[in-house]
């Protein structure tokens, strides 16, 4: 039985660590809730590209794709952990866009400007 973590998941977890460390080092109060690691569960199902349980108790990610697309979904799910609402409200998109910008500046994410397939769904930055 192979118990090694898939390489693309390992890379995304390292980028996630870099983001958390940056938020700690800069005392980013807006994203203070993201400074502690959230457990990540990987899957290869195509009906769900990502989910967030109880605002950061666990994040599930489809890992059938390249690391940038996986990171896109992780950022999307992390943004859900920053607001009380469960929908994609204006407040959600504000937090999401700020996280995208931080990750871009850290060099751990390249924006996806065109609709692109990932795990059977279209993903794109808004």
Task: State where each predicted segment sits.
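Active-site recognition of the HExxH zinc-binding catalytic motif
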Residues: 72-84
